[in-house]
């Protein structure tokens, strides 16, 4: 039996769902909400209950019922006695219906207008109330008046809730005119048991009273019914609109499908005509027929599979006895989906049956006359370059006997043979190593002869220590550089530029100490002219000879400046004669070298020296092209804590600009800032100009070449490639153990090493220190430089020193506070210096202390045993007398008997009489005991000696 939901019943009878739920509960049905379901019989019972519209008791007053509206339930309570008062309870509406209230008030006003003389009769009624007839009437009248006042109060409260109007105005309407209009009806229905006695002379008659609550409830129910009918009408209109919209949508969809089908038919017809045209042009019908057969077979296979699937499903259905309804629904959905899928497949199959689109012919391209190839090009790359199909090239290679695919690399010979077959001239591409900076210094063909201009000469000042090199530069620059140098010697290269007679001269100041040989050689390699300073009082010194050799090796002209001619012992002629022995011959003697006698301290003949420099530069014809990208050499490099790597560069060709991508040695970067020799920021540097730059990712080596690249990407690639090559070269230089050097390697393991970590302010000082320390010769000990770098001593250096048991040497640098604290904690030694030869001396002493000490025996004295005493639990005590030297408590002794040493050991005790003493002198007597020896005899000789350490020289 089917079921109905309560909200469906409410919709059917035009009632609210809440009323239907209440009626169902009243009838004893187990329902919870409007969504609850009831049986068909229960539904009919609910509908019939609404149609009957159950009435109250006969004795109770009833309200007027509108058509098809259920009367609200009214409960009447009667009181017996003289008062005869009735109490009426009316179910309150759930919500106020203002429209119903307005209609009720309109009806009341219309009834009031129809009444004649309402105001006059009401006045008489008021006067009648004031005239009581007798005691009984007054008593009953008082009671009725009291009851009426209570009724009026209740009526007023009901009217305030219903109409939200003035209670005073409502009182007149309800009590006056409405009572007269509905007097007969109220009396007939018996709503009111109390009669209004005011203004009447019949105190015992009972006039009916209007039940306004019931009236309002009836109006409310009528309005609800009207609203339900309107809602149902709107709902049916909406449903009809939806149905019409759905029909319109389906019609539009069918029209679109029809148009699409027509378009597909036109397309199929066009494709069919194209296929017929192509079949006429094809010479071979066999291939077309086989293709069609294959397509028909492919179409037949799915049908066969579907038939097999259908039969298998029927068999399964026969075997299965019962099917679940839910499974049937799901299978039905799947079957519909498969049906749609088959339809789509059918469309695709239909499209596959149509002829394929004609292949557009490739546009013809002329073959190039020349083809530049590289080793290892693939077939696809060659085809793209000559604008041919890869399959065509593969075919040609196959005819040539070469099996290749389009992604296979070909060698140069195969590519040349292939190009000959095509009639193209093949040329191998000359690959340029972008990471090779040295090619710019070896080949100058990239320079433009039209842009070559004269450049400033680069002059290097060389000479022995304290011969006046820095003093000369100080005089030239009018600055005090020499006073800032530690120990009066120059520690690293300084590059400066001065102007003389409108022309610029760049000076490089090189150190004169023996440790800076590599720096002097580097200075000579970048210079144009060398000024060799020789002190007139000292003459030629070892570093002077070294500077001469460097200049000759670099092939640069030499100008000799004989300095300190103001000193009393100056002898310039001796200097000229000594230099002649090394091939430096003055022009006065018929040579090619210019000699100038100067006094750098007193600024004597300085102008003459500068004029000589400009004259030699003019003879050398120094030229440069400032328009090309800059190249040059690193003069010095250091690491700054705030700025990072700082490199002093000497521009040799081109112009260096800020933001230029640059490769310096094995590192790369971009020129972030540029500072000249005066400490001023500049935006560009022309040839022969020294500048300091920042922006490198690492600190380069002094003497490295640099070059500016077109973009940062190329500079990065070149820098990384150079760094990779340097690392590979370093690994190749690692010594491998072989049978030939196995003995030397094992022997080297016996040599003690002093591990050092070098940190300096500039790269040149690092190189000089490392080279000098390695050259220290102490037999059995060598220096091992664990790490060397520029910059302050940091925590990582201390950690490395602790791990390798090394000493940290700081040259013109200081440790950070954190590094100093860590060094104190880890007990790592840090030595700070500013003069190089003191570093060398200190390390040499440490190397000597590393060797095992060498001891030499020293005899202190001799003694003769005069008497022996044997003491139990102690041993033998020998009484002796010193015959030579002395015997000490901490000395070793030998027991000699018959000129044969029978024991060698330590003294256990030494006494003079009963006192323990440290030594017994010559011609004194005493007693002694020897450790682990009790075989002392009279006349044994006791020889006392010690081992002394020999100081190494």
UniProtKB/Swiss-Prot annotation:
Residues 191-207, 282-291 have a biased composition (Polar residues). Residues 509-512 are annotated as: G3. Residues 599-601 are annotated as: G5. It comes from the Bacteria. Belongs to the TRAFAC class translation factor GTPase superfamily. Classic translation factor GTPase family. IF-2 subfamily. HAMAP family: IF_2_B. PANTHER family: TR-TYPE G DOMAIN-CONTAINING PROTEIN (PTHR43381:SF5), TRANSLATION INITIATION FACTOR IF-2-RELATED (PTHR43381). This is Translation initiation factor IF-2. It comes from Streptococcus pyogenes serotype M5 (strain Manfredo). The gene is infB.
């Amino acid at each position: 039996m089917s079921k109905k939901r309560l909200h469906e019943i409410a919709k059917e009878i035009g009632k609210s769902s809440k009323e239907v739920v209440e009626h169902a509960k009243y009838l004893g049905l187990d329902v919870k909400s409007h969504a609850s379901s009831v049986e068909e019989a229960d539904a009919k019972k609910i509908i019939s209950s609404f149609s009957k519209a159950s009435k109250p008791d006969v004795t109770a007053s009833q309200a007027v019922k509108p058509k098809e509206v259920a009367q609200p339930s009214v409960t009447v309570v009667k009181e017996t006695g003289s008062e005869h008062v009735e109490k009426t309870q009316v179910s309150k509406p759930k919500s106020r219906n203002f429209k119903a209230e307005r209609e009720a008030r309109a009806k009341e006003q219309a009834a009031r207008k129809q009444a004649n003389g309402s105001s006059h009769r009401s006045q008489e009624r008021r006067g009648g109330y004031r005239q009581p007839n007798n005691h009984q009437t007054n008593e009953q009248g008082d009671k009725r008046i009291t009851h009426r006042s209570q009724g009026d109060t209740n009526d007023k409260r009901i009217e305030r809730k219903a109409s939200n109007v003035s209670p005073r105005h409502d009182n007149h309407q309800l009590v006056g005119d409405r009572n007269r209009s509905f007097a007969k009806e109220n009396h007939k229905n018996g709503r009111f048991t109390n009669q209004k006695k005011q203004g009447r002379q019949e105190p015992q008659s009972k006039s009916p009273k209007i039940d306004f609550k019931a009236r309002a409830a009836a109006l409310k129910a009528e309005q609800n019914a009207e609203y339900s009918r309107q809602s149902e009408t709107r709902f049916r209109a909406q449903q009809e609109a939806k149905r019409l919209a759905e029909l319109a949508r389906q019609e539009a969809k069918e029209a679109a499908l029809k148009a699409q089908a027509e378009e597909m038919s036109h397309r199929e017809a066009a494709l069919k005509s194209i296929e017929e045209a192509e079949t006429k042009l094809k010479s071979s019908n066999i291939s077309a027929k086989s293709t069609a057969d294959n397509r028909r077979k492919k179409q037949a296979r799915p049908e066969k599979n579907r038939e097999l699937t259908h039969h298998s499903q029927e068999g399964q259905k026969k075997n299965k006895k019962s099917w679940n309804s839910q499974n049937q629904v799901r299978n039905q959905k799947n079957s519909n989906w498969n049906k749609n899928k088959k339809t789509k497949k059918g469309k695709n199959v239909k499209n596959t049956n149509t002829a394929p689109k004609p292949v557009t012919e490739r546009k013809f391209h002329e073959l190039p006359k020349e083809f530049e190839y590289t080793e290892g090009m693939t077939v696809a790359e060659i085809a793209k370059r000559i604008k041919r199909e890869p399959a065509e090239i593969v075919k040609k290679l196959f005819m040539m006997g070469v099996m290749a695919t389009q992604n296979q690399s070909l060698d140069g010979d195969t590519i040349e043979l292939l190009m000959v077959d095509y009639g193209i001239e093949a040329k191998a591409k000359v690959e340029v190593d972008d990471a090779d900076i040295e090619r710019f210094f070896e080949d100058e063909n990239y320079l433009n002869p039209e842009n070559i201009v004269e450049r400033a000469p680069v002059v290097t000042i060389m000479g022995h220590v304290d011969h006046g090199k820095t003093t000369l530069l100080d005089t030239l620059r009018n600055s005090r550089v020499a006073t800032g140098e530690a120990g009066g010697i120059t520690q690293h290269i300084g590059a400066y530029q001065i102007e003389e007679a409108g022309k610029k001269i760049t000076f490089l100041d090189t150190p004169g100490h023996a440790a800076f040989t590599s720096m002097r050689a580097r200075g000579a390699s970048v210079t144009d002219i060398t000024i060799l300073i020789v002190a007139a009082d000292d003459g030629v010194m070892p570093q002077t000879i070294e500077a001469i050799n460097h200049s000759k090796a670099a092939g640069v002209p030499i100008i000799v400046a004989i300095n300190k001619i103001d000193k009393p012992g100056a002898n310039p002629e001796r200097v000229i004669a000594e230099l002649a022995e090394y091939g430096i011959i003055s022009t006065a003697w018929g040579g090619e070298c210019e000699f100038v006698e100067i006094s750098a301290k007193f600024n004597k003949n300085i102008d003459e020296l500068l004029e000589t420099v400009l004259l030699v530069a003019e003879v050398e014809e120094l030229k440069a092209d400032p328009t090309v990208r800059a190249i040059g050499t690193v003069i010095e490099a250091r690491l700054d804590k705030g700025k990072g790597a700082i490199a002093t560069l000497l521009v040799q060709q081109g112009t260096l600009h800020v933001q230029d991508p640059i490769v310096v040695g094995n590192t790369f970067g971009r020129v972030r800032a540029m500072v000249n020799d005066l400490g001023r920021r500049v935006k560009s540097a022309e040839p022969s100009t020294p500048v300091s730059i920042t922006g490198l990712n690492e600190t380069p080596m002094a003497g490295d070449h640099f070059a500016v690249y077109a973009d940062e990407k190329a500079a990065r690639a070149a820098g990384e490639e150079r760094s990779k090559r340097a690392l590979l070269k370093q690994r190749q230089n690692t010594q491998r153990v072989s049978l030939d050097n196995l003995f030397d390697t094992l022997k080297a393991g016996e040599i003690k090493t002093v591990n050092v970590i070098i940190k300096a302010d500039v790269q040149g000082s690092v190189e000089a220190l490392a080279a000098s320390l390695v050259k220290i010769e102490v037999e059995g000990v060598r220096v091992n430089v664990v790490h060397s770098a520029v910059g302050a001593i940091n925590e990582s250096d201390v950690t490395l020193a602790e791990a390798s048991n090394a000493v940290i040497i700081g040259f013109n640098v200081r440790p950070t506070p954190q590094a100093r604290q860590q060094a104190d904690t880890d007990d790592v030694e840090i030595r700070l210096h500013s003069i190089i030869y003191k570093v060398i001396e200190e390390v040499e002493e440490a190397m000597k202390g590393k060797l095992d000490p060498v001891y030499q025996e020293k005899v202190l004295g001799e003694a003769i045993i005069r008497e022996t005493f044997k003491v139990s639990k102690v041993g033998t005590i020998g009484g002796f007398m010193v015959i030579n030297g002395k015997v000490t408590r901490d000395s070793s002794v030998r027991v000699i008997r018959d000129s044969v040493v029978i024991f060698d050991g330590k003294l256990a005790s030494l006494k003079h009489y009963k006192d323990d003493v440290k030594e017994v002198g010559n011609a004194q007597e005493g007693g002694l005991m020897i450790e682990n020896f009790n075989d002392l005899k009279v006349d044994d000789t006791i020889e006392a000696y010690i081992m002394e350490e020999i100081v190494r020289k």
